Amino acid sequence: MAWTPLFLFLLTCCPGSNSQAVVTQEPSLTVSPGGTVTLTCGSSTGAVTSGHYPYWFQQKPGQAPRTLIYDTSNKHSWTPARFSGSLLGGKAALTLLGAQPEDEAEYYCLLSYSGAR
C-alpha cells in the first residue's frame, strides 16, 4: 500500500499591529490513497475567522504554488472537488476527501492580519 505524504507550511500576510502573530500547524501528515485528511491553520492571536481571509496553496516539486482555496472556502475552477476549505475549532481547515497520488505536495496557508487582502 502506498502512502501519500502531505506537508503543511503556513504563511502570514500583511504586517501591522498584529505583526507578532504566530501561526501553528501540523509539520507533516501522511494519508493513504483514498483516505481523508484535514490540515489546520491556527493563530496565536485567537480564533481564525473569515476576516482572516484564509487561503490555501498547493506546491508540487519544481512548480510554483497555486491557490486551491481562497476566502475560507471558495474554490478556483482548477481546484479538484475533493478539496474543501472551512473553519474548524477556531482554525482554518483544508480537507482532502479521497486522496490521490497526485495530491502529494506541500500545502501552505495564508492569513491576513490587516483586514485587507
Swiss-Prot record:
* Location of the Ig-like domain: 20-117
The segment annotated Framework-1 runs over 20-44
Q: Does the keyword RNA-binding apply?
A: no
Subcellular localization is given as: Secreted; Cell membrane
Chain intervals for the UniProt region annotation (Framework-2): 54-70
Which Gene3D superfamilies does the entry link to?
A: Immunoglobulins (2.60.40.10)
- Which PANTHER family does the entry mention? IMMUNOGLOBULIN LIGHT CHAIN
Its quaternary organisation is: Immunoglobulins are composed of two identical heavy chains and two identical light chains; disulfide-linked.
Q: What is the name attached to this protein's record?
A: Immunoglobulin lambda variable 7-46
